Swiss-Prot record:
Pfam families: DMRL_synthase. GO terms for biological process: riboflavin biosynthetic process. GO terms for molecular function: 6,7-dimethyl-8-ribityllumazine synthase activity. This is 6,7-dimethyl-8-ribityllumazine synthase. Disulfide bonds: none annotated. The gene is ribH. It comes from the Bacteria. Transmembrane segments: none annotated. (2S)-2-hydroxy-3-oxobutyl phosphate binds at D86, T87, R128. Gene3D superfamilies: Lumazine/riboflavin synthase (3.40.50.960). Forms an icosahedral capsid composed of 60 subunits, arranged as a dodecamer of pentamers. The active site is at H89 (proton donor). Catalyzes the formation of 6,7-dimethyl-8-ribityllumazine by condensation of 5-amino-6-(D-ribitylamino)uracil with 3,4-dihydroxy-2-butanone 4-phosphate. This is the penultimate step in the biosynthesis of riboflavin. GO terms for cellular component: cytosol; riboflavin synthase complex.
């Protein structure tokens, strides 16, 4: 019986893309900083990290698909923040973004990590962007490293 489990060891030559929405920039900038710090702390050179900004979470799947099709990145980290408002717009954006990112991952076989915060209040986002619930950008980066390692092991 074989057992496979990824760890944080990734080839030094591996490239990572961080896609981040500009919407709610105060939150997303903190997520990006956490992701970059986490990748660098695990041996990924700054030159191997591409940061791409998009207007909002809605645009993340399209850019992720373009990057995945180019096959230049070992993983694509997506970061954003959607905060519930008074309309149903929140559900449309958060749900369709997640569905689109999953489709890109499955269609191209490249890990696409969903670090888009879908929260009720700005305080919930702050708690997940370096506050009491940690930094989800850091967590997404660690998951990306682990997935790259795991996929290298699988037959």
């Amino acid at each position: 019986m074989s057992h496979y489990e990824g760890d944080l060891r990734t080839p030094e030559s591996a490239r990572f893309a961080i896609l981040a929405s500009r919407w709610n920039a105060r939150i997303t900038d903190t997520l990006v900083a956490g992701a970059r710090q986490s990748l660098a702390g695990n041996g990924i050179a700054e030159a191997n990290i591409d940061v791409i900004r998009v207007p909002g979470a809605w645009e993340l799947p399209l850019v992720a698909a373009r990057l995945a099709a180019a096959h230049e990145h070992a993983a694509i980290l997506t970061l954003g923040c959607v905060i519930r408002g008074d309309t149903r717009h929140y559900e449309h954006v958060a749900d369709r973004c997640a569905e689109g990112l999953m489709r890109v991952q499955l269609d191209f076989g490249v890990p696409v990590l969903n670090g888009v915060l879908a929260v009720e209040r700005v305080e919930d986002a702050e708690a997940r962007a370096g506050g009491s619930h940690g930094n989800k950008g850091e967590e997404v980066a660690l998951a990306a490293l682990e997935m790259v390692n795991l996929l290298e092991q699988l037959p």
